[in-house]
């Protein structure tokens, strides 16, 4: 792994190199043991008021989201209205899928590259080009308006949006060995759509915008549900920071590149967040919650007011781990530009307007580049 160690007294630091849509970037990381996050570092927010008819209640939650988004870029949410039964069914179905023989799983292979739904096997993805290939398997479902109850007739979607959409392309026919699989994931996907749209309006409020400010940009979103299967890492010890010997990652150090991510994780843990001080902290599983993290779009539109935070996963639990991230962003036909109210009088915009399809293409190109950049 490519890192440079600097001795500046105690503790030592190392430079973590990351791929981004703007080229390589670095973060300074403390070479200290990974520790559990404090409640103040990754706060728990009760979001039930965002479903209230009272705007004052919704604004109160938006203020808490604003604080979390500016300080760490990660927070837990509870009372999110995603039925526990839907979560349990999706989790059970994911375990059933990944425990099949490889020759069965590859029947659902994502054959058309990064813009396709389906299965990706071990060693096929590398989120961070200076770290090892991700030690995971995945199955993903891209946004399909045929699965979106808010779209009455996909045939009437305007062409600028429809050309980026994936109508009927999820390879559910290749999961026929698991009759319950499709129903479980469609139900969970639809529940995540509802939650993501509610959170989008809460984020708009958190920025002192009308609640509907982003509605048009997510009418036909760039969204995907991904299930990750992480076998236990067999090194026998967790490393404290990039650059230590025998470092292996379940998923490498990265930021998410859309608007935000809604993550469900099982009880085995493994998610680590790089805080502002440069220390890796564990976002341990909290029953009944999701983890929400800010993506690159929200950092860009807020002119760096909100933080798209570096994170990774290392499964040293000794057990199989499953996580189910739901990635949510503006439609691929939309663009992303800095909001006027996020620039002070003498503050310049740090980012040019970018087409969402161009941004996503750049980031996905890094994800599937398995060449050694170390």
Curated annotation (Swiss-Prot):
- Which Pfam families does the record cross-reference, listed alphabetically? 2OG-FeII_Oxy, DIOX_N
Q: What is its EC number?
A: 1.14.11.-
**Name of the top EC class for this enzyme:** oxidoreductase
Q: Does the keyword Iron apply?
A: yes
Swiss-Prot/TrEMBL keywords: Dioxygenase, Iron, Metal-binding, Oxidoreductase
Under catalytic activity, the entry for this protein gives: peramine + 2-oxoglutarate + O2 = 8-hydroxyperamine + succinate + CO2
Q: What stretches pass through the bilayer?
A: none
The Gene Ontology terms for molecular function here are: dioxygenase activity; metal ion binding
Q: What InterPro entries does this protein map onto?
A: DIOX_N, IPNS-like_FE2OG_OXY, IPNS-like_sf, Iron_ascorbate_oxido_reductase, Oxoglu/Fe-dep_dioxygenase_dom
Q: Does the keyword NAD apply?
A: no
Pathway(s) this gene product operates in, as recorded in its UniProt entry: Secondary metabolite biosynthesis
| PANTHER family named in the record | 2-OXOGLUTARATE (2OG) AND FE(II)-DEPENDENT OXYGENASE SUPERFAMILY PROTEIN-RELATED
What protein am I looking at? 2-oxoglutarate-Fe(II) type oxidoreductase ppzC
């Amino acid at each position: 792994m490519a890192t440079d160690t600097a001795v500046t007294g105690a503790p030592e630091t190392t430079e973590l190199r990351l791929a981004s849509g703007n080229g390589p970037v670095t973060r300074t990381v403390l070479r200290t043991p990974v520790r559990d996050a404090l409640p103040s570092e990754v706060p728990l927010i009760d979001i039930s008021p965002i479903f209230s008819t009272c705007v004052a209640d919704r604004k109160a939650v938006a203020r808490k989201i604003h604080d979390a988004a500016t300080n760490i870029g990660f927070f837990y949410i509870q009372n999110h209205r995603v039925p526990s039964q839907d979560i349990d069914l999706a989790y059970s179905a994911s375990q059933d899928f990944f425990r099949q023989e490889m020759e069965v799983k590859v029947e659902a292979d994502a054959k058309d590259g990064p813009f396709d739904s389906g299965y990706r096997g071990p060693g096929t993805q590398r989120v961070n080009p200076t770290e090892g290939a991700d030690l995971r398997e995945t199955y993903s479902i891209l946004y399909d308006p045929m699965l979106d109850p808010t779209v009455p007739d996909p045939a009437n979607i305007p062409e600028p949006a429809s050309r980026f959409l994936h109508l009927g392309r999820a390879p559910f026919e290749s999961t026929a060995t698991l009759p319950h699989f499709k129903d479980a994931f469609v139900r969970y996907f639809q529940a995540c759509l509802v939650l993501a749209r509610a959170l989008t309006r809460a984020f708009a409020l958190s920025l002192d915008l009308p609640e509907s400010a982003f509605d048009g940009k997510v009418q036909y979103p760039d969204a995907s549900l991904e299930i990750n299967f992480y076998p236990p890492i067999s090194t026998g010890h967790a490393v404290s920071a990039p650059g230590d010997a025998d470092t292996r990652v379940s998923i490498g150090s990265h930021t998410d590149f859309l608007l935000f991510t809604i993550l469900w994780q099982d009880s085995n843990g493994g998610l680590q967040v790089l805080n502002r001080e440069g220390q890796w902290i564990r976002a341990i599983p909290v029953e009944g919650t999701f983890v929400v993290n800010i993506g690159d779009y929200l950092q860009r539109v807020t002119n760096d007011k909100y933080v798209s935070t570096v994170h990774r996963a290392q499964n040293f639990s000794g057990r199989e781990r499953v996580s189910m991230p739901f990635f949510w962003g503006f439609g691929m036909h939309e663009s992303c530009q800095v909001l006027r109210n996020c620039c002070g009088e003498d503050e310049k915009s740090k980012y040019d307007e970018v087409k969402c399809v161009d941004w996503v293409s750049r980031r996905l190109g890094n994800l599937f580049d398995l060449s050694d950049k170390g």
